[in-house]
Amino acid sequence: LLARPTTKEAPQLANLLIVIAYVAVMLGIGYGCMRRSGTVSGFFLAGRNLGPWMSAFAYGTTYFSAVLFVGYAGRLGWGFGMHALWIAAGNVLFGSLLAWWIFARRTRRMTARLDALTMPQFLAARYQSPFLRLAAALVIFVFLVPYTASVYQGLSLLFQSNLGVSYEQAIVFMALLTGVYLIMGGYLALAFTDFLRGLVELVGVVVMVAFLVHLKGGFTAATTALTDPHAAPALLPPLPGKPAPMFPGWVTLLSLVFITSFGPWGLPQMVQKFYSIKSEDDIRRAMIVASLFSVFIAFGAYYTGALTHLFYGADVKSFLTAKYHLPAGKDPLDYLMPDFLTTKVPAVVSMTILLLVFSASMSSLSSLVLVSASAIAIDLYAGARADANSRSVVALMRVMCGAFIAISLYIALNKIDFIVNLMALSWGAIAGSFLAPYCYGLFWPRATKAGAIAGMLSGLLTMLWFVETHKAPGNPAVPVASALAMLVPVVVVPVVSLFTKPPDAAHIKNVFG
């Protein structure tokens, strides 16, 4: 037991100590926030009292999860080369800058006026429809599961290389840690830890990109090499792959830009950040910070994914399949970034990247779990029981946080694959359900209850129809269907609203002030 660690064990022990220190800080934050999370508003929105930096980092770390670094960056960086940076540009401009500029102030003002804490509460109050509250809560709870499970993916090789632990041990550890500090401190603990994790992610991205381009002669040399036609896959013909793709590459790329950039406009876990900011005066600063954070994270991740073309040959799929003994049907590109980040960099850089991916995973998992728990505790339980007190709702929310983490862990342990398509599936279903009713509800007084219900159902049914007819999530055309699920309600809501009875004038005056 007291023997000197071997050469391989010594760095793993040092890395383990770093992770333990990191975990201790997370738990300390959770414990410190317990006293301020006793009310429903305190637990779920930190009392609507977060400053601009905390709000911006909470938004950014929720937006860019481990799915980006492990799934999107690898698969899309390999599939599109430098063209994948168009996705990063869309994420920065539309997903961050315009999201804060257009929606934050109006959302903060209107939800406070309606006393709405959640997306289902807002839709029900804005459209005077209890049905929307129930339907929205069910959509959130059901369709956040695939995305939550996908957050765990890709951690295995990074943990095995740096800490010598298995995939199962890694994700159980992450789930337990997330559950403990989230159950203790709620959204306030999440915001504090997101700020810390955001700093870790920024440092990790800079170190990762700097080292990798150094291996290829610097940023200019690496970028020049990536602009070579052989390193930038064509977008006009269909992308190679099985099953045969249904759309040209540029259509798939455009769909990915759309769903990852405009999808956050209707995702409850993203919109929540607008509810909780302290004042409207803080929104401009939060917008700037969130946008700058997105520049570093999005461009760093997709640029790193494109760099894989300079380190691997065209036979990368066969290489990864053989190296990791992958069974038939398992996409080897899900292993591209983990292999890349554990075999091409020294131990200290790999450990930095591990903390980056670990931080991104916990940030997204926390936000998803909290929003899902609110759907049950606030929207279903408190919505059905007029006598429900704040203490019982908070207690149920804590229980549901634990339950939802357990469900997502079960799915992840049963090897749910296709990281990118899982994310696209959940984003398509949720954003397709909420994007149009939410946006029209904020800005168009003429939007009606019937229009909102029709819009929600049309988006959801579009996505479900595609899943059934095209056997998603394995089909690579899922991003195209997700984009359609978001676009269809944009047309349906105004058309149905114009042909149905206008909302009550007094109610609209109260809603819009």
Task: For the regions a language model picked out, list residue spans one by one.
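Membrane-interface "cap" regions at the ends of multi-pass membrane proteins
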Residues: 4-71, 182-185, 198, 217
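Transmembrane helix-loop junctions in multi-pass membrane proteins
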Residues: 31-32, 67-76, 82-83, 144-158, ...
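Terminal cytosolic tails of multi-pass membrane transporters
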Residues: 1-7, 375, 470-513
